[in-house]
Amino acid sequence: MILAGRASRSMTGWNERIALAEKLDAPVLSSIKLAAAFPTTHRLHPIPPFQGLPKSAAALIKSADVILALDWLDLAGTFKQAYGGEAIGAKVIHVSCDAHSHRGWSADYQGLPPADVYMLCETDAAVPLLLEACAKRTASVALPAKPALPPIPDAVSLRTVAVALEEATRGVRQRRH
């Protein structure tokens, strides 16, 4: 599975992240705390972006055999929410430059996540190399069904606004200035 965190805004990087997820047939999670790093309407993005880890996302993380964290914000906290005190059963590949900002005396790094492989680089440097090096895979875990929106929502939520905006702008091309 892929935790899509901080990434550049380049179309090349965007397309490479999609290609990697598709090649690995890996579900992708994203956080509402960060700018989009993966299309939330993609079939491999089964859970809407979140702030606190929902149970469905925790279950998906716990079922993964490999977790590729692409500069995920507070990876240690996410693992703590998903696994509690249990050992992490997946191999963890952590791509991040966070180590440059960690100062041990101030403990301003939240928590240090376990990693089987730590790649000290930005997401856009790692993804093309991973895309080239990885073999195509078929998912071993079924994706959870995307929750349907009620026909007329009782309240306005970020998700209902996002879905309405996506539906209203589907097929509209951005003008270049």
Each predicted region: which residue ranges?
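Anionic-ligand anchoring segments at beta-strand to alpha-helix junctions in alpha/beta enzyme folds, i.e.
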Residues: 1-67, 168-177
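Generic low-complexity, intrinsically disordered sequence content enriched
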Residues: 24, 75, 134-135, 147, ...
